[in-house]
Amino acid sequence: MKNVLKYLLLALIAVSQLFACGGSDDEKAPADNFDVQFTVPGSVDVTEGGECTFAVSGGGRKSPLTTDTFILESDAGISYVCPIVNTTSDSFTVRLADGCETGYYKVFVKRDARKKSFGRIYINIVEDIDFKPDAGTTVYGIVSSAGVGVENVVVSDGAEVTVTNEKGIYQLKSAKKWGYVFISVPSGYEVPSVGVLPQFHRALKNSADVVERADFKLEKVDGQDSYKIFMLGDMHLANRTGDLGQFAQFTSDLTDYMTRHKGEKMYALTLGDMTWDLYWYSNSYYFPQYLNTVNSQIKNLQIFHTMGNHDNDFQTRSDYDAAVKYVDQICPTYYSFNIGKVHYVVMDDIDCSSYDGSTSRNYVKSLSAEQLDWLAKDLSHVDKTTPVVVAMHAQVFYPTTSGFKIDHDPVNTQRLFDILDGYTVRFVTGHTHKLFNVTPDAPIVDGHNFREYNSGSVCASWWWSGNLTPGIHIGTDGTPGGYGIWDVTGTDFQCLYKSTGWPEEYQFQIGRAHV
């Protein structure tokens, strides 16, 4: 009897181990063990509901089966099932599912219960424009309004500059250094916005040897013969010294002003230092938080942006790397646009080439040769009779005891002046947290028809005065924190500085001394 029980016990143990081993094998079996491998490009251009083909890669690998399921999963977690319509040993083709929009997607192939991941792709939904790019072209696209191509729109990658043809199509032999392409928004049009940011540029997704397409949409608008543009000097938002609460007072003031002038065209242009690099890491406040703050408080206003020294990443070691976060999340560091009869140019005059990754932030006030080369090409499409507004963060001139001096790299500044010679130019700058103007009759201007408006700051004294003495919000020269308001009618400019919390008429105050 004991022997029988012994054998039964051994048999049960053996059977249990057999089932345990079988279950373990199933649990450890990879969910993606079917033999499919293909190349996922950085992006694909495809018409709505159109087809796209993928190359099969890997020695001995195979295409998916037509009975497999090809899935695109959006960043929002929505899955789109795209039918596999054809397969060969070298490639396979899928038809884009209805509802797929331009954007990033995770790529999966599912076979039975097994699901295999293949990475991430950018799906670019485009119109069929029946156009084959020239040899050497790496970026092309169409600029259109209401489904019709717009001719003579200036397009650039920051180095090469071209214009759209009669069908609104452009092409560039771009090295894709900056990874974007932008248009100079033409007069009489606007681009769509994401929050306050006008969408005049497109990020490129592929390497320089891959041809890709980037399209732009324009909306025709009226009312640009007379409009207002707000000049927003240094903000220095960093979530410190009560800055966010004080900033809300500024946005409330701006909103009230816009409400009183409802029906008029309005735009805005920052003058740099929207953020404060020292607090990007310690306070976790930089461009995403800045945009959240601004977008929650300012509505129905396109804000073009200028880069300041504090908008560069100090934990880098080159001018290019210092600007990467700004370019990725705000816009190009230099570009142009048109409103009405005025051509606006935004430039980056903070050179961070000597950054060493520390808080020393050894920048110089200078315009790169690359920017100046681009500017000359950009202005070749602008008539000399067109007024030009050049926005930069750091001042071109600076007051001295006897007048003004050039406060920039002298060599590149002289080249800037040479390029702008013959134009009526208004420089608008920030950086100093002060107010001063330079007019064409100043000797330092040397006969050019140049003006400079150093346009104060939103934050006044880096928000310190309002934090220490609530209700007193002044800069180092006594100017209250505020913003510029330019009324532009045709080619005529009326420029006003508005102090936050005060009416436009409040322009000067003298304190009486107590003796």
Residue ranges and their predicted role:
Residues 40, 46-116, 158-160:
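Immunoglobulin-like IPT/TIG beta-sandwich domains and homologous Ig-like subdomains
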Residues 186-205, 210-212, 280-382, 407, ...:
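Extended active-site neighborhood of metal-dependent phosphoesterases/phosphodiesterases
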